[in-house]
Amino acid sequence: MEHLFICPRCHNSDPKYIGYKNGIPYCRACISFQGKLAETSYQIQGDPVLHLDYPLSKAQEEISTQVLEHVKSGKNVLIHAVTGAGKTELVYQSMEYILKKGGHVGFATPRKDVVIDLIPRIQEAFPKLSVIAVYGEHDSKLEADIILLTCHQLYRYPSYFDLLIMDEIDAFPYRGNEVLHAFFQNSIRGSYVLLSATPSEKDIKEIKDDHGDVLELFERYHHHKLPEPVLLEKKRFSMIVTVIKKLLQYQKENKPTFVFVPTIELGEKLFSILNLFVSHGSFVSSKEERRRIDIEKFKANEFHYLVTTSILERGVTVKNLQVIVTDADHPLFDASGLIQIAGRAGRKIDAPEGEVIFIGKEKTDEIQRAITEIHRYNEKAGLL
């Protein structure tokens, strides 16, 4: 019967997404994911020794040790760590353990930009191992000692990874995508570690139902509190004037700034106005081909501010960054996204503070939740 077919790759059983060719069923939900698969016979080529030029904080060391013990016992883990806590470092010890046993290690994340940014960090931590990145237009080589990849590429690795780390499980497009979630599950033959600054109740329930454990880290590695957002309730004209004044102030103080917008259209309009009054800025979004070039110019202080969509809510770390969120009451800004955006500020040990300003016509439930959660994290870390 038609409705009994279950796709072996993405587990789809919905008749609406099942087609038939010559009487044989096929899945339309994941048919677009086509390409060669990784060779499971690959063996580690280099020396899997972890090398860190900096010490972990006491809290990081404790979590890292707990993760390792869980991985040794075959147990899965969800790490709930605040933005800037140093989540990536928490899995290095476990990666080293699996690699020394000759196992396959993967580090997946929803966004290509984050994969690219991870390459030098992982290569520095494991300098004697080969590290590759696999994403949309970069998939000619699939095997290496450590594989960094977008979650879209996990279908190439069925029952492959002895340890699979999935970063940013709360991020688009992984969040709520059953096909990508199935690819993740299918690629595991050992243990997995999930990383998130804003896991949902569903995420926590699923890991516990899977007999896994939830580990929490509410303290940043530099022991300073998370910058807590301030809400300014203003209508559009007043909002734009406020942003211009703040950008001019930050430029005088030599403070780089992200100005977040909910949509590309609003971002283009806002930047066209800001650019008349404040120089040395640019607009970036998922549609901008020059995005990575503009980000590098921003890091080099050629640009003093970037107007950006949520594309920069993760992955980019800049010293002394200030954060402004315009139209913070827009329905596209949920509490999870606002927490991530606020987490861009104060990440560097030599600049652990920064302003986070939400501007909107009113205080929404999502704004209140974000402000409340960030305050709660600081309380739990004992920093208030």
Kindly give the residue locations of the regions a language model identified.
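Interdomain "pre-motor" coupling segment immediately N-terminal to P-loop NTPase/helicase cores
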Residues: 1-45
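N-terminal pre-P-loop "Q-motif" helix
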Residues: 52-73
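Conserved interdomain linker/interface between the two RecA-like ATPase lobes of SF2 helicase motors
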Residues: 77, 211-272, 278-281
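Conserved strand-helix element at the start of the C-terminal RecA-like helicase core
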Residues: 80-88, 98, 103-118, 247-274
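Conserved helicase ATPase core of P-loop NTP-dependent helicases/translocases
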Residues: 129-143, 283-309
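Post-DEXD/H (motif II) to motif III coupling segment of the RecA-like Helicase ATP-binding lobe
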Residues: 159-163, 168-231, 242-245
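Conserved RecA-like helicase motor core of SF1/SF2 enzymes
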Residues: 168-171, 299-304, 308-352, 360-365
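Conserved segment of the helicase C-terminal RecA-like domain
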Residues: 189-202, 344-371
